[in-house]
């Protein structure tokens, strides 16, 4: 294993560890909070995080072994099963992101009718369609024996068949990426554009109210006025930043792998192994980006995490420090000294006799 493969293996280990931890946190938050579970977006997020968790636990270790050893798993039939999971989970993740973007558009564009338009039951039906579509493509690839170890990507996934089957395989690959990449990207862009329009209208209304309030409050302190203007600028760019991050992560993670897969179909193109492994690692990094983009950085999940940490800290007993133990010992000694009578000294006795004699003389 050369230095390039060692760097890619280290990158894959980091992606695997962060993906396991972040997606497990999302599932733990949804299991802890009943409010998150009953939302339609919560059902979609559970499906997305569960798929990423399975990808990190079952698929990424085999790719790591392929990078380190450069060969297929020794167990018979294991590579076909891992390739089936890889195709299914990648397609399911892309379609789940499209469903989440549609859910966000309905929540922002139709806030009063959102609960009736997309209930958890309808979200389950939507996920059933996504699962059925992903299973159809994975089952077709498994039935045609197109799943196996690909040395260009060091993973168990789709591999090039012999020359007579290349046209069918090319049509299947183009259809798979059209449904699993182009369609979710189009849905993501269209719904994000609608969300951005609604957010821009809301920002314009809030800016009008803010400017009128600043014009009426003439004696307002300049620092407060400047703070209001800064918040106004942040409010304008907040929706654009969130939408841009969602689209950019989707493109950065999926586009290199999809383009490499399509270029692999050209007869005179040979895929470099290091580039193929890097593009595969980028697809795995979507399992790291999605929990932070759609879950952990949002306010409901932050509140649930804070509540879980607070409850955990309340249950754990505090270890007694040396300062507290010294105070306890001092208190015990003080109570003991208060209970024991003090012996009268000779000096105090002489002073008492002198006081008694002085009192008798005055009387």
From Swiss-Prot:
GO cellular component terms attached to this protein's record: plasma membrane
InterPro entries: GPC_Orphan_Receptors, GPCR_Rhodpsn, GPCR_Rhodpsn_7TM, GPR26/78-like
Disulfide-linked positions: 79-156
Listed GO biological process terms: adenylate cyclase-activating G protein-coupled receptor signaling pathway
Membrane topology: Multi-pass membrane protein
Predominant localisation class: membrane
Residues on Extracellular side: 1-7, 69-80, 144-168, 264-277
Record's compositionally biased regions (Polar residues): 343-363
Organism from which the protein derives: Homo sapiens (Human)
Tissue expression notes: High level of expression in placenta. Expressed throughout the brain at low level. No expression detected in skeletal muscle, lung, heart, liver, pancreas, or kidney.
Region: Disordered, residue numbers: 340-363
Entry annotated with the keyword Cell membrane: yes
Name the UniProt record assigns to this protein: G-protein coupled receptor 78
TM regions (residue ranges): 8-28, 48-68, 81-101, 123-143, 169-189, 243-263, 278-297
Keyword entries, A-Z: Cell membrane, Disulfide bond, G-protein coupled receptor, Membrane, Receptor, Transducer, Transmembrane, Transmembrane helix
Top-rank taxon, per record: Eukaryota
